[in-house]
Amino acid sequence: MCGIAGWYRRGGRMVPGDAIVAACDRLKQRGPDDSGFLVEGDFGFGMRRLSIIDIAGGRQPIFSPDGRHAIIFNGEIYNHPELRRELAGSYDFRTDHSDTE
């Protein structure tokens, strides 16, 4: 079990970063092992993580290789080892075992 929080403000108004942190702090019981946040202008999201798969390398948010895109993921992809092998030639994985990447 993990927890995700997000905030979007229309009209280009800045999202208060401390509000995302506070929202995720309220989710600590859902994910006591780790937290991660991203605030960019009018959008922000954060997460609390219960570390099960790739405890050290699965920190979030995870960014695309060019840094333009970020993801926070809550779920499990059970066949991620097979998918990783299948995509190995076309994607440069940065973690060893994360099912998010």
Predicted regions and their residues:
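N-terminus-centric sequence/structural signature that marks the extreme N-terminus
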Residues: M1-E101
